[in-house]
Amino acid sequence: MLEIYEVIPAQEMQNKQTQLTVELRFDERQKSRHKTQTTCGKDLGWFIERGYVLAHGEGLQSKCGEIITVVAAKESVSEVTAENTHQLMRAAYHLGNRHVPLQVDPTKLAYLHDHVLDDMVRGLGLTVTAAQAPFTPESGAYHGTTGHGGGHSHSHGHSHDHHHDHSH
């Protein structure tokens, strides 16, 4: 099994030659520890920084030096379009208020398919279309990155004792 402890940012992957890919759903890309297989059937497991979300185009570097390209798998998503920007912003506000992972593109929003959310968004006057597409939501304001993922992890799969005396 290929053991992964390092993530290579997508920008750096443009200069790398890789032969292995792994296709992952959003829920898999959020895991700090996960076992799966490459698209050609090679076993791999990663041990990366907790809270890190793998992004489409990033690389996973194995302990033995092999590099695997991360591909965002197609998933059931709801795509939201509107007649104007104001409507789209209102939908983003209401979905964000429900803490829904949200992909924000210039002319549409997308979230993992949920018929209750679809009904809410339609009730706001927007168009919701079911689709099969890669899902790359915003990483959030507190993750230290902008846009759809990014960053760099050098987690090495070890833990530290964080025992603190908290006497008051």
From Swiss-Prot:
Residues 151-161 have a biased composition (Basic residues). GO terms for cellular component: cytoplasm. Residues 137-168 are annotated as: Disordered. It comes from the Bacteria. Signal peptide: none annotated. SUPFAM superfamilies: Urease metallochaperone UreE, C-terminal domain, Urease metallochaperone UreE, N-terminal domain. Its main location: cytoplasm. Gene3D superfamilies: Urease metallochaperone UreE, N-terminal domain, UreE, C-terminal domain. GO terms for biological process: protein folding; protein-containing complex assembly; urea metabolic process. GO terms for molecular function: nickel cation binding; unfolded protein binding. It is found in: Cytoplasm. SMART domains: UreE_N. Keywords: Chaperone, Cytoplasm, Nickel, Nickel insertion. Transmembrane segments: none annotated. InterPro entries: UreE, UreE_C_dom, UreE_N, UreE_N_sf. CDD domains: UreE (cd00571). The keyword Chaperone applies. It holds the Pfam family UreE_N. The keyword Transferase does not apply. Involved in urease metallocenter assembly. Binds nickel. Probably functions as a nickel donor during metallocenter assembly. Belongs to the UreE family. This is Urease accessory protein UreE. It comes from Saccharophagus degradans (strain 2-40 / ATCC 43961 / DSM 17024).
